Amino acid sequence: MDIFLQQMVNGLTIGSLYALVALGYTMVYGVMRLINFAHGDLVAFSAFIGLSVYAQIFGESVTSLIAVITVFIFTAAIVAVVGVLLERLAYRPLRTAPRLSAVVSALGAGLVIQNSVMLIWGPNMKIFPSNLFPATIWEIGGIVITFTQVMILGLSS
């Protein structure tokens, strides 16, 4: 039973991240009537931006809530600017064009973002420092809940 409950906690954590991405797709489609195929690329781009902001400001050695909030604010601002540029350059000129044109533009924007990430950060995987968040662990009846899981669930709800 402990394994089942542990996997429920793990599933809720991952599912809440998927729900945030799906919410982004839904919001864009609701406003623009366009499936933004570059949305996932922007999510990945924001992770690389966050990692770079953390390394530049804190040197990968600071573990505090202030550091996490600072990285989040800087990352959100940078990705918001990129999102506005994407909308102005790739989507707005095609508002009156056929839907297929906007879909092709979204696919192209995704490719540009992917290749820009590979050009800037390289093709190899990058890993966030494990000390970014406190290593606090709560054990409740055999179920292990980490600080990161609590933070993900709290921010996504």
Question: Which sequence ranges carry the predicted segments?
Answer:
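Small-residue-rich transmembrane alpha-helical segments that form helix-helix packing/gating elements
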Residues: 1-34, 38-157
